[in-house]
Amino acid sequence: MKNEINAVLENMTTTIPEPEDYTGEDGLLYCGKCRKPKEAYFAPDKAAIFGRDRHPAECDCQRTAREEREAAEKRRRHLDTVEELKRRGFTDPTMRDWTFENDNGRNPQTGIARRYVEHWEDMRTDNIGCLFWGGVGTGKSYLAGCIANALMEKEIPVHMTNFALILNDLAASFEGRNEYISRLCRYPLLILDDFGMERGTEYGLEQVFNVIDSRYRSGKPLIVTTNLTLDDLHNPEDTAHSRIYDRLLSMCVPVRFTGDNFRQETAQRKMESMKKLITD
């Protein structure tokens, strides 16, 4: 043990010189590049403790190298964290590509999505969610994914899924319904995509309500995308739908999506590309 302690003390108090280093007039080792000392003298009382009069000091070159190493390590840890968040947070790998950077800029609601991210702390504190509603292919899911990706890049956990998957998971869950729903509610932001497309059985509607109600009680924001209209949501067909929609509208600010069907445009471009390839 004594030898180990001595080895540690030796490492703490000894500087290994580089070929270009030199000894200054004060007797300390200096860096041959930046001309700053690589050693400093102990105070007299400390010198007695360590049995020597000097200890290593950082020159400018060493400080720069250390800061670069620390920055690289910080970047690596950040990338690892974001990768893990996206692995857990997305139920479809293609969602990773739904980013503001990849956006074509044509959706008029992009600004709202960006501001949601910019003001996330306020949204989180005030429990403000969004209900993205509108026609098929108008970019609702894409912008919800942009929000998810942007927040995860800030190391904020987000989960984006849909009720079809949730109902399947609940049916196959070994951890129990309550624990599964509690896990969903632990995410700072939950995004439910394609709401209203799930099967409308009594069991299905009950689980939909349980998830939304649990999220409501958690006090955490929720973003929902749906092809349903506000008229559909304000005029439910029965009591089961009424209590679901009521909870939803109390949590989420409606944002209407209008305009071109981007999926149809993409399909048309692919068709034209195929025609060109097979006719050339």
Give the positions of each predicted feature.
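A short, basic N-terminal segment
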Residues: 1-104, 267-280
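Pre-Walker A (pre-P-loop) alpha-helix and adjacent loop at the N terminus of AAA/AAA+ ATPase modules
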Residues: 88-90, 94-130
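Short glycine-rich substrate-engagement loop in P-loop NTPases that contacts/grips substrate
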Residues: 108-117, 148-189, 199-206
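Walker A/P-loop nucleotide-binding motif
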Residues: 124-144
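Residue-level preference for the first positions of well-ordered beta-strands
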Residues: 127-131, 158, 189, 221
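Walker B catalytic acidic pair
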Residues: 194-195
